[in-house]
């Protein structure tokens, strides 16, 4: 079953093009994206790999990153493509 996570991401532009995506709270989350319009899909795949890693190693996933069931608002920043 899918869960909703709140995870800060750092997008670092690369000289050769594209971006490296990491998270300061999940050091295992490292991926690259060529086109920022694909970031949701790419990060979702990387996040699924991190979740699987935690399960396989028996490491407990940080509960503070799970957004479901919270009674308070979730701060959400996003990149939005708009205009022409």
Which residues fall in each region the model found?
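Residue-identity detector for glutamine
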Residues: 14, 37-38, 70
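Proline-rich low-complexity regions
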Residues: 24-27, 62
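Short, charged, surface-exposed hinge/linker loops at domain edges
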Residues: 1-7, 41-84
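Short, positively charged
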Residues: 2, 9, 13-15, 33
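Intrinsically disordered/low-complexity terminal segments and short unstructured peptides
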Residues: 19-21, 30, 56
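A short, exposed loop/beta-hairpin motif centered on an aromatic-Gly-Thr core
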Residues: 27-38
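Short aromatic-glycine-(Arg/Gly/Cys) micro-motifs in beta-strand/loop hairpins
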Residues: 11-25
């Amino acid at each position: 079953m899918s869960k909703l996570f709140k995870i800060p991401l750092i997008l670092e532009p690369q000289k050769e093009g594209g971006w490296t995506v990491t998270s300061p709270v999940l050091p295992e989350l490292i991926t690259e994206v060529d086109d920022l319009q694909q970031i949701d899909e790419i990060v979702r795949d990387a996040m699924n790999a991190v979740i699987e890693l935690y399960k396989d190693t028996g490491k407990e996933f940080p509960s503070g990153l799970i957004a479901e069931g919270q009674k308070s608002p979730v701060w959400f920043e996003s990149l939005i493509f708009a205009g022409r």
